[in-house]
């Protein structure tokens, strides 16, 4: 009698459990109910329409296990053809992996008080400037009430954004409750004056970075949608990107901000045409950093005194450093916080670009010799005397705690983490299971069976390609550490009149008979004009001593 083997999915570390109810019909039906319930819920939040790209189920993967449910949201950038259109529309911000989740709208639906309340905005097409009436997607009865459809095809976009937010930006800064204290008067007036009178400052990418277009019009939770500039969590909006990456970045201010401000921009070495654009972007970033260094770290208007104060505290940092600190393991906070987060009480804008460049160059050279983590508390005590704003000091103390203890950013200080926690608790109560929601940044699509299966399904839906060409493309992109891959297609592969058949493609070793092998498996169904196609993917990871098995697919 043949030996009954365990299913391949049990071989993964997270599935290895002694729960005997894995094969029972009761729990199988429960998993199916949870999956259907979750998918119907996500599909009803923001369905795709002619005006909106929507929240598509292809952007999330729901994995059910005996004791846990994992929901992974994938936040890709917009297609390139849509990016080129957006270059002529400065009012629209580009889709980035850390902001797309907020635009997709699943969390906003949870906090809405009135499901039938209309939210009207004016969306103008590129060709015909006609008014388009957009409504909240929760009111499904009025989805098709669209007036004045543009002549030209309108691009996909999220129509519930305010295009005229920058007109009232200085007014919002002055009346915001976060800066009503007399200590903030000089800072608010300085920023508002700069916004109103300096058009070149509005066009810079650093302006779009700190003053993003994320505000909502009305509602009881509008305080969560206010500008990042008028929220106390401004520091965490900026630091969120750095703490989500496990590997620390070398602190070159130009490189860091270039990577942060323009994440989708091509490198100058890869595109010859982008050399001039890259240099101009670096110049703008350098000048803007110098402006913040001069205007935000000094209490007086004298540039020479500000330079002396900065040089003095750099020397303090050098005296506190310890042996063993290298350029690749430096901490981001001390000088990043000193250049961006210490506000001042005076008003003054300097126009000496040469002095700015000298100050910036001195800062960049001295940043390589940073203080060690065990001495960072002593340095911060000296840095506190430069600030004078109590709320920022509290935030700085919390940032120190995050760096020293390697914690994540507390959800109560950031609306993103706060809303994710609310959504996690909502889904856990609805499905009676422990639901985990994680926003992930994909390292490589071709090292996870579920992602490869999703990619194949998208290719078969959008355009008819031969299965051999799809498999050949996947084989070329397989990273190191993957020992082998096997893909099987089943169904009516070519024509509706053809009988159903199965084709399997194999690359290297993909043995499913050895229990100790680390194998990932994922099935997916593709709905085509000829019927349903089944796609199954097996990936075998290598476990040699010289290489580590790629079991961690995502970078949290």
From Swiss-Prot:
GO CC annotation terms, alphabetical: mitochondrion; ribonucleoprotein complex; ribosome
GO biological process: translation
Key words of the record: Mitochondrion, Ribonucleoprotein, Ribosomal protein
Pfam families: Ribosomal_S3_C (PF00189)
Domain of life (superkingdom): Eukaryota
Keyword Protein biosynthesis: no
Cellular compartment(s): Mitochondrion
One example GO MF annotation: RNA binding
Transmembrane segments: none
Family: Belongs to the universal ribosomal protein uS3 family.
Summary of subunit composition and partner proteins: Component of the mitochondrial ribosome small subunit.
Name of the featured protein: Small ribosomal subunit protein uS3m
Originating organism: Arabidopsis thaliana (Mouse-ear cress)
């Amino acid at each position: 009698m043949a030996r009954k083997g365990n299913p391949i999915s049990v071989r993964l570390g997270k599935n290895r459990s002694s729960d005997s109810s894995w094969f029972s019909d009761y729990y199988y039906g429960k998993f199916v109910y949870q999956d259907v319930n979750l998918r119907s819920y996500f599909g009803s939040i923001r369905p795709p329409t002619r005006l909106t790209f929507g929240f598509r189920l292809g952007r999330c993967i729901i994995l059910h296990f005996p004791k846990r449910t994992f929901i992974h949201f994938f936040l890709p950038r917009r297609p390139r053809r849509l990016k080129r259109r957006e270059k002529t529309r400065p009012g629209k911000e580009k889709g980035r992996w850390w902001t797309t989740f907020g635009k997709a709208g699943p969390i906003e639906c949870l906090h809405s008080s009135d499901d039938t309340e209309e939210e009207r905005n004016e969306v103008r097409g590129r060709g015909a400037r006609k008014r388009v009436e957009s409504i909240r997607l929760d009111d499904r009865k009025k989805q098709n009430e669209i007036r004045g459809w543009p002549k030209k095809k309108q691009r996909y976009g999220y129509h519930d954004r305010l295009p005229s937010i920058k007109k009232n930006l200085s007014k919002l800064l002055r009346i915001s409750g976060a800066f009503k204290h007399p200590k903030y008067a000089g800072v608010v007036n300085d920023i508002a004056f700069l916004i109103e009178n300096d058009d070149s400052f509005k066009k810079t990418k650093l302006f779009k970075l700190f003053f993003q277009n994320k505000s909502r019009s009305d509602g009881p939770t509008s305080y969560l949608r206010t500008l990042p500039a008028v929220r106390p969590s401004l520091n965490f909006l900026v630091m969120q990107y750095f703490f989500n990456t496990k590997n620390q970045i070398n602190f070159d201010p130009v490189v860091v901000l270039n990577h942060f401000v323009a994440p989708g921009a091509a490198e100058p070495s890869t595109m010859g045409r982008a050399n001039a654009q890259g240099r101009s972007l670096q110049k703008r970033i350098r000048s803007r950093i110098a402006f913040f260094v001069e205007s935000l770290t000094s209490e007086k208007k004298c540039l020479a005194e500000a330079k002396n104060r900065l040089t003095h505290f750099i020397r303090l940092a050098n005296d506190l450093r310890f042996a063993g600190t290298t350029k690749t393991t430096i901490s981001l906070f001390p000088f990043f916080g000193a250049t961006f987060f210490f506000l001042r009480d005076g008003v003054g804008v300097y126009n000496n670009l040469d002095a700015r460049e000298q100050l910036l160059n001195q800062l960049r050279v001295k940043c390589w010799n940073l203080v060690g983590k065990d001495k960072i508390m002593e340095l911060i005590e000296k840095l506190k005397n430069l600030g004078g704003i109590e709320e920022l000091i509290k935030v700085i103390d919390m940032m120190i705690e995050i760096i020293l203890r390697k914690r994540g950013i507390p959800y109560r200080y950031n609306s993103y983490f706060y809303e994710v926690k609310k959504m996690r608790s909502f889904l856990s109560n609805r499905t009676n299971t422990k639901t985990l929601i994680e926003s992930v940044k994909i390292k490589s699509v071709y090292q996870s069976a579920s992602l490869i299966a999703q990619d194949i399904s998208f290719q078969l839906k959008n355009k008819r390609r031969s299965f051999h060409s799809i498999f050949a493309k996947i084989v070329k992109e397989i990273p190191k550490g993957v020992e082998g891959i096997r893909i099987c297609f089943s169904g009516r592969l070519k024509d509706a009149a053809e009988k159903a058949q199965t084709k399997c493609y194999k690359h290297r070793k993909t043995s499913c008979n050895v229990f100790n092998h680390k194998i990932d498996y994922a099935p997916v169904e593709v709905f085509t004009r000829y019927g349903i196609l089944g796609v199954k993917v097996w990936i075998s990871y290598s476990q040699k001593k010289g290489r580590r098995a790629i079991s961690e697919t995502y970078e949290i």
